[in-house]
């Protein structure tokens, strides 16, 4: 994988391309990309300026979506913009712009993951700084506030649980482990569905995807394989990455949103 190029200094290339684009999509991860990372995930909200930019893009006919590992209802409440695509639980839950929701996980699997969450809670409750988050189809083990010794003990417990329970996979993110069903579902499978639904795989279409974490690499690799015109953007200092472009952080993401909106106004892109 080659090093991604900084996107903002190269924006003029995309501005020229947008003059010939008839369909545009903008999709982004949430934590660490659209908003900064916080020690308390419950304190995160997008700012009013970011919300207005997303609303303005959507009003111009741009397909806009936010994809996250968060529970779908939690994600929707924190972004708070109507008419967007929302993907939660790393692709296991989806809400379309009309507000219709779709779950990509069966009731037995949901029950399995609920039981797993209870098991992890019982085994990790004594470790300070370790927090268990039960989601629809996944279980997250957060260790941002834990000391190194507690992190090592938690990792050992998780490895033992994985050995005891089949048909699970583990994703390591930024100060979090995600345990999920071993099913072919990811942010990329959800985004591929959205791309088809929004006709972004047709000629004269272009879509962007921004992300900062290891889970976003599924999307970046998928974008490299697809034949649709797409711009993959790694946010932050994660290297190596399959993304072709890079932004330094949420501050530059807001600048990009402003550039994109200005280009849409200039070229009347829809």
List the predicted regions and their residue ranges.
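Charged, glycine-interspersed solvent-exposed loop segments at helix/strand-loop junctions
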Residues: 130-148, 167-180
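Substrate-recognition "cap/lid" segment bordering the active-site pocket of phosphatases
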Residues: 89, 96-114, 118, 173-203
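Asp-based phosphoryl-transfer active-site loop
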Residues: 17-39, 66, 191
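Mg2+-dependent phosphoryl-transfer enzymes with acidic/Ser/Thr/Gly-rich catalytic loops
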Residues: 2-9, 21, 188-270
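Substrate-recognition/cap helix-loop segment adjacent to the acidic, metal-dependent catalytic center
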Residues: 70-89, 149-169
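Active-site phosphate-binding/coordination module
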Residues: 37, 44-135
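Short amphipathic alpha-helices and their capping/turn segments at secondary-structure boundaries
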Residues: 5-22, 74-79
């Amino acid at each position: 994988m080659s090093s991604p190029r900084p996107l903002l200094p190269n924006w003029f290339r995309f501005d020229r391309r947008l003059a010939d684009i008839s369909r545009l999509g903008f999709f982004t991860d949430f934590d660490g990309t659209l908003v900064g990372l916080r020690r308390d995930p419950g304190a995160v909200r997008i700012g009013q300026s970011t919300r207005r930019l997303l609303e303005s893009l959507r009003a111009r006919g741009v397909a806009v979506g936010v994809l996250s590992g968060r529970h779908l209802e939690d994600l929707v409440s924190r972004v708070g913009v109507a008419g967007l695509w929302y993907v939660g639980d790393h692709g296991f839950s989806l809400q379309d712009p009309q507000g219709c929701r779709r779950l990509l996980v069966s009731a037995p699997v949901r029950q399995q993951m609920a039981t797993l969450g209870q098991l992890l809670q019982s085994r990790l409750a004594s470790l300070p700084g370790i927090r268990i988050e039960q989601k629809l189809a996944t279980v997250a083990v957060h260790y941002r506030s834990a000391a190194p010794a507690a992190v090592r003990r938690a990792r050992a417990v998780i490895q033992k649980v994985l050995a005891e329970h089949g048909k699970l996979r583990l994703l390591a993110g930024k100060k979090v482990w995600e345990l999920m069903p071993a099913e072919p579902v990811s942010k990329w499978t959800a985004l591929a569905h959205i791309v088809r639904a929004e006709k972004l795989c047709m000629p004269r279409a272009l879509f962007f995807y921004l992300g900062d974490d290891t889970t976003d690499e599924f999307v970046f690799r998928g974008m490299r394989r697809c034949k649709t015109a797409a711009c993959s953007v790694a946010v932050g200092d994660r290297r190596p990455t399959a993304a072709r472009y890079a932004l330094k952080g949420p501050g530059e993401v807001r600048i990009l949103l402003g550039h994109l909106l200005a280009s849409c106004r200039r070229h009347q892109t829809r």
